[in-house]
């Protein structure tokens, strides 16, 4: 059970920053 929770947390820790960076880059490209 602990490994599943840790794995899910790790996925979120990776996806959230990637999503934020991706969104910022898209907004920057659209701005131009």
Swiss-Prot record:
The chain crosses the membrane at residues 9-27. This is Cytochrome b6-f complex subunit 7. Component of the cytochrome b6-f complex, which mediates electron transfer between photosystem II (PSII) and photosystem I (PSI), cyclic electron flow around PSI, and state transitions. Belongs to the PetM family. GO terms for cellular component: cytochrome b6f complex; plasma membrane-derived thylakoid membrane. Keywords: Electron transport, Membrane, Photosynthesis, Thylakoid, Transmembrane, Transmembrane helix, Transport. NCBIfam families: PRK11876.1-2 (NF008826). The keyword Chloroplast does not apply. It is found in: Cellular thylakoid membrane. The 4 large subunits of the cytochrome b6-f complex are cytochrome b6, subunit IV (17 kDa polypeptide, PetD), cytochrome f and the Rieske protein, while the 4 small subunits are PetG, PetL, PetM and PetN. The complex functions as a dimer. InterPro entries: PetM_cyt_b6/f_cplx_su7. It comes from Prochlorococcus marinus (strain MIT 9211).
């Amino acid at each position: 059970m602990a490994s599943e929770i840790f794995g899910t947390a790790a996925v979120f820790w990776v996806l959230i920053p990637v999503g934020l960076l991706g969104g910022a880059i898209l907004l920057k490209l659209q701005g131009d």
